Amino acid sequence: EIYSSKSSYYDWAKIRFTSQFRPKLSLKKKDPATIQLGYDGTLEDVFTGFVSGNYDGGTYANEVALKDEMLLMEETIINDTFLDTTPQELISYFLAQAGLSKMKLSSKTYPTRKMLPIRRQTAVQAINAVNAAWGLRVPFFFSGGVFYWDEKPEQKKVYTFERGVNILNLRRAGGVWELETVSAPFIKHSHKINLIHPQVSGEVEVSKVVSK
């Protein structure tokens, strides 16, 4: 099971397996993990991240939980006072402290802040502090191992979903449309898709992707 949403700081995944594989698995927290899905020998990365806790095959657990790179940000503590900085400079520093370098940050120009103290906060909390200090409400998340702040992942193609072709079910729940389809590993949240259906048609933005 894989969960990815615009409204969540991090993506997560759970891998469940039968008892016959339990003794063969031994994983440590922060071991790297990748999940791939695809067709005809062509695979797409649908999740990249890390094991979120130690797993010993000798236990009775039959599930491994994973989190994306935000796990490293949650465990990185920022404790400093920053002078004459911009949001992008601060966020780049937080990422570097977590050992992360792949990022795409907004190119918008923001005024320099003379001083911003951050005391014993995780890197995630520190980013929220930066947003608050500049009065910003912008999304940030990881996708494909890249950190995005007020930016979206590149999309090379807008895929079409059509009733009777690749739409299994389409219903409206909680003010949003939920589309059920076959596995679509190439679709990420914040991507655009094209819908052809009697209930709703046109180009829409994906807010959440759940794979089971």
Language model feature labels by segment:
Residues 2-23, 149-212:
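An acidic/polar, Gly/Ser/Thr-rich interaction patch typically located in mid-to-C-terminal regions
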Residues 22-24, 72, 101, 135-139, ...:
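Short beta-strands and strand-coil junctions in structured, solvent-facing domains, enriched
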Residues 48, 88-92, 124-128, 187-191:
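Extracytoplasmic/secreted envelope proteins and their assembly/folding machinery
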Residues 76-84, 112-117:
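Second-shell loop/turn segments in exported
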Residues 81-85, 182-185:
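Short, surface-exposed ligand-recognition loops at beta-strand->loop->(often short) alpha-helix junctions
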Residues 61-71, 104-172:
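Short beta-strand-centered interaction patches in the first periplasmic/extracellular domains
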Residues 1-71, 205:
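Assembly/oligomerization scaffold segments
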Residues 87-103:
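Glycine-rich, acidic and aromatic/proline-enriched surface loops and short helix-turn segments
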